[in-house]
């Protein structure tokens, strides 16, 4: 993913992977959870502690439940728009003073979301959306074909 930092114009790229990590004791209904499993950061930016995004509940994050994200739309936000769309996630990211955010779902072979890509730029007003789409296709192919060998 490091190569996509330059291609997308991002300083940060995160891979958000969805899973069912626990269930309701009374009903057995599973809670949809996620982990941020990969983080690519350019050499001049500080790391965001992705450990706090382990086995986290998706329902806490408005942006991950967005209808547009579910329709596989590529979502673009300025810092202010991102904070308005999901204040909790913006707080968790530590208000890194980004200029732009892009979020895109990753789908399996059956069209079901198994994760998302989150690209963040602190320098560029515009993230290269075509490169984000190319990264999503590459990651979908890896996951849908059994992973990295």
Where are these regions (language model features)?
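Intrinsically disordered, low-complexity terminal regulatory regions
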Residues: 1-44, 139, 146-149
């Amino acid at each position: 993913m490091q190569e996509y930092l330059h291609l997308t114009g991002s300083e940060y790229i995160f891979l958000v992977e969805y899973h069912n990590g626990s269930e309701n004791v009374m009903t057995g209904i599973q809670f949809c959870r996620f982990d941020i499993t990969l983080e690519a950061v350019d050499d001049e930016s500080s790391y965001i502690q992705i450990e706090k995004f382990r086995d986290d509940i998706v329902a806490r994050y408005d942006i991950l439940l967005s209808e547009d994200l579910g329709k596989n739309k590529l979502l673009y936000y300025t810092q202010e728009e991102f904070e308005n769309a999901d204040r909790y996630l913006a707080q968790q990211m530590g208000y890194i003073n980004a200029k732009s955010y892009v979020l895109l779902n990753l789908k399996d072979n059956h069209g079901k979301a198994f994760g998302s890509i989150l690209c963040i730029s602190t320098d560029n007003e515009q993230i290269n959306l075509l490169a984000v789409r190319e990264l999503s296709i590459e990651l979908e192919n890896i996951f849908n074909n059994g992973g990295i060998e």
